[in-house]
Curated annotation (Swiss-Prot):
One of its GO terms (cellular component) is cytoskeleton. GO terms for molecular function: ATP binding; hydrolase activity. It is an enzyme of class 3 (hydrolase). It catalyses: ATP + H2O = ADP + phosphate + H(+). InterPro entries: Actin (IPR004000), Actin/actin-like_CS (IPR020902), Actin_CS (IPR004001), ATPase_NBD (IPR043129). This is Actin, macronuclear. Its EC number is 3.6.4.-. Keywords: ATP-binding, Cytoplasm, Cytoskeleton, Hydrolase, Nucleotide-binding. Actins are highly conserved proteins that are involved in various types of cell motility and are ubiquitously expressed in all eukaryotic cells. It is found in: Cytoplasm, Cytoskeleton. Belongs to the actin family. PANTHER family: ACTIN (PTHR11937). Pfam families: Actin (PF00022).
Amino acid sequence: MAESESPAIVIDNGSGMCKAGIAGDDAPRAAFPSIVGRPKMPGIMVGMDQKECYVGEEAQAKRGVLNLKYPIEHGIVTDYDDMEKIWHHCFYNELRVTPEEHPCLLTEAPQNPKLNREKMTKTMFETFNVPSFYVAIQAVLSLYASGRTTGIVVDSGDGVTHTVPIYEGYALPHAILRIDLAGRELTEYCMKLLYEIGLNFSSTAEREIIRDIKEKLCYVAIDYEAELKAYKESSQNDKSYELPDGNTITVQDQRFRCPELLFKPAFIGKEFPGIHELTFNSIMKCDVDVRKDPYNNIVLSGGTTMFPGIAERLSKEVSALAPSSMKIKVVAPPERRYSVWIGGSILSSLSTFQTMWITKAEYDESGPSIVHRKCF
């Protein structure tokens, strides 16, 4: 069996970042933006060995002359040609491996359309000729990475936020909830807040600047109203940020008004529940006998949960909704930005997992639909 000889490749396809590496490592070797850029004016970049498309960091560096596209929206691949370019870049440029020689584990958001998995499977076997393949649900991997098999994962990345109760290693599908509000919406909202104070950022290139401001300066207020009041009374919490052109801007109460959107989606006119209500509703859909465990093991995962103060605030909000006798514990592992990848690395290097792979022979016999039988 080929699997045992070479280590597996683990790729966590996020809407914003693609994380990739070798199973058994404790962190991904590559993490690059899931972006494909094509020249706005083909043929104008003379003498630069112009390519028809750029991927990841390179696309970001040349963003001024490119049109940028994210092939994954809300956790679902919307453009398979671009996605193929990202995977190709991943194997050959970032990891420098030949996919024909390694089993490959990919991740996906829960409640993804069946067709999405089938297309992933088809691409991996037919375009990249991998010897064996598996698709795992992101939230389950995050829980493994935190050393638990039971709990509820609040996973918020760039494109989608979901709450996934997991019991003894299995996601409870009837209790999974998801909202299409995550990092990308926060970036857009931050853009809107800065526009209110006269700063206009609108192009795809400038959006990356906003994303950086959001990641470096924003935080979640424990008490939103009190924080607003404090900012009105003094300006000592203002932070300055230097733009790429050398100008400096001052970011004020936008610092906490931006991530507040996670708790109050109504700010942008969405009728979604906030992440605290989502967590509570998800737990309430579980069987009454198993609710104690998820309340006590709320595990945060994904880049959008990296805001300072988010764990304390979520704990406070869920406590207000839950029965008063219930013990609430929010776990925020420091490596949660990569916890999905880490879980994938752990899972695919277990000896007990080696029989779970979909092999090329099984694929040839059953076609892409084999993925629904072997990966759940």
